[in-house]
Amino acid sequence: TEDDGVALREIAWVQYKKSIDRWFFWESTYYNDYQGGRGQTNVFQNAATFSGPTSMNASLGETGWNHSNGDGVLFYPGTDTVFPAESYGIQGPIASLRLKHWRRGIQDVDYISMAAAVNPVATQAIVNKMVPKALWDYGVANLADPTWVRTDISWSIDPNVW
């Protein structure tokens, strides 16, 4: 997606902070854009994995309703049978950077949990510094549809901070 690499690493930190036991991705191999009607996607040639009608914007590039690059793709095909010219001929999938960042966040939480067993107050202070606000911490935009308020993120996008 149009997001920084740390976003997937940060998900595990939010899970820890909010005591969320599970976090599921909606899809990991979304190569067929049946929702947007674009059909099979050559993920090695086209980053857009799904979208509705799109247009070109001079500063943003291709945009449109629900336009998303790489969303729903955590793995790439090692052997591509739909687009064989792009196939790498590898048995099994190729892990995406998104998957690797998510794994790194889960590993971070393992260390956070060990640190919390020794000093929970100091550990929580570190978590709160790294992820000041997330999800519903900003409030609710519409009480009839209690989704979180859309706002700027509260954590650093600098990978060196993480």
Labelled PLM ranges:
Residues T1-G37:
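Catalytic-core regions of glycoside hydrolase
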Residues I20-D21, G37-W162:
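Catalytic domains of carbohydrate-active enzymes that cleave complex glycans
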